Amino acid sequence: MESANASTSATTIDQLCKTFNLSMHTLQINCVFCKNALTTAEIYSYAYKHLKVLFRGGYPYAACACCLEFHGKINQYRHFDYAGYATTVEEETKQDILDVLIRCYLCHKPLCEVEKVKHILTKARFIKLNCTWKGRCLHCWTTCMEDMLP
């Protein structure tokens, strides 16, 4: 799948599939971190999260679910700037909270309006990691809360 044009033009799973005339179901792509092949479910999840494809040595790479979560945690510990409520995010970005691209700090999915509103209603803070605002998606929110239960 090596191609000079692909490495410069295809930045998403969808674009990669179109460039090489493949379906997501038949695409085989490795994790940039652990080098294992992504499962079909991980490929669909990666595309759903609007994450970018990386090229190394002319070959495309993505990230498996395990490595995404692992590196999300590492990023949280290494690059934590500060935490703030929705008003802080709005003041800093000069945008309405619903218009700001905020990703989950664990799975990296873009937060939808419902997830942002949940942060506001529960008075949960967004966190700024490496100069980028992050939050928790509903899936990871539930997972985090389960860890707190006896």
Curated annotation (Swiss-Prot):
Q: Please give the name of this protein.
A: Protein E6
Instruction: Quote the subcellular location field of this record.
Output: Host cytoplasm; Host nucleus
* Record keywords, A-Z: Activator, DNA-binding, Early protein, Host cytoplasm, Host nucleus, Host-virus interaction, Inhibition of host innate immune response by virus, Metal-binding, Modulation of host cell apoptosis by virus, Transcription, Transcription regulation, Viral immunoevasion, Zinc, Zinc-finger
The answer to whether the entry has keyword Zinc-finger is yes
Pfam families (alphabetical): E6
Query: Any other noteworthy remark?
Result: Belongs to the low risk human alphapapillomavirus family. The cancer-causing human papillomavirus E6 protein has a unique carboxy terminal PDZ domain containing substrate but low risk E6s do not possess this domain.
* Subunit record text: Forms homodimers. Interacts with ubiquitin-protein ligase UBE3A/E6-AP; this interaction stimulates UBE3A ubiquitin activity. Interacts with host TP53 and EP300; this interaction inhibits TP53 activity. Interacts with human zyxin.
GO molecular function annotations of the record = DNA binding; zinc ion binding
Q: Which domain of life is it from?
A: Viruses
The reply to whether Lipoprotein figures as a keyword in the UniProt entry is: no
One GO CC term of this entry? host cell nucleus
Q: Which organism is it from?
A: Human papillomavirus type 6b
What's this protein's family per the entry? Belongs to the papillomaviridae E6 protein family.
Q: What does this protein do, in the record's words?
A: Plays a major role in the induction and maintenance of cellular transformation. E6 associates with host UBE3A/E6-AP ubiquitin-protein ligase and modulates its activity. Sequesters tumor suppressor TP53 in the host cytoplasm and modulates its activity by interacting with host EP300 that results in the reduction of TP53 acetylation and activation. In turn, apoptosis induced by DNA damage is inhibited. E6 also protects host keratinocytes from apoptosis by mediating the degradation of host BAK1. May also inhibit host immune response.
Any one GO BP annotation for this protein: symbiont-mediated perturbation of host apoptosis
Q: Which residues belong to zinc fingers classed as unnamed?
A: 31-67, 104-140
